[in-house]
Design a protein with these regions (language model features):
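PRPP-associated nucleotide enzymes
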Residues: 3-156
């Protein structure tokens, strides 16, 4: 994935946009591997409440600082599940007139998709399991695990 992204963005002015909090570890690893000229920015957007399912309501709690007009934007997300959050986000970002807008996800759950959106770059396609670790959490916990694992849902 890293090599393909570097090739796709060679010679371009790129904004690498991290979606907080879950994508931080993936974002850090990805940014170190990319060989193109880039700036980093951060956004916090969520459709999850305190549980494991989307609330259906997308909320921005921290907007990005950089202008993306005429720039190539790569959204870095931990996981694409229903797609509602990223669909909402891409619609917002398109109004800011970027030169291009693409999505890189560490994990993709296509069987959970509720809207017509797909990532441009995917680390791993996974089944419909609730996963934690490497930035992914359950109620704010387990983000620091150095791996991705399936959470036992019996107690959830």
């Amino acid at each position: 994935m890293y090599k393909r992204q570097s090739e796709d963005y060679a010679g371009k002015d790129v904004v690498l946009l991290c979606i907080l909090k879950g994508a931080v570890q993936f974002f850090s690893d990805l940014s170190r591997q990319m060989t193109c000229n880039l700036e980093m920015d951060f956004m916090s957007i969520s459709s999850y409440g305190n549980g494991t399912r989307t609330s259906g309501i997308v909320r921005i709690s921290k907007d990005m600082d950089l202008s993306i007009t005429g720039r190539h934007v790569l959204i870095v997300e931990d996981i694409m599940d229903s797609g509602l959050t990223l669909n909402h986000l891409t619609n917002i970002l398109k109004t800011r007139q970027p030169a291009s807008l693409r999505i890189a996800c560490l994990l993709d759950k296509p069987e959970r998709r509720e809207c017509a959106i797909s990532p441009n770059y995917v680390g791993f396609v996974i089944p419909n399991e609730f996963v934690i670790g490497y930035g992914l959490d359950y109620m704010g916990h387990f983000r620091n695990l150095p791996y991705v694992g399936v959470k036992n849902t019996d107690n959830m």
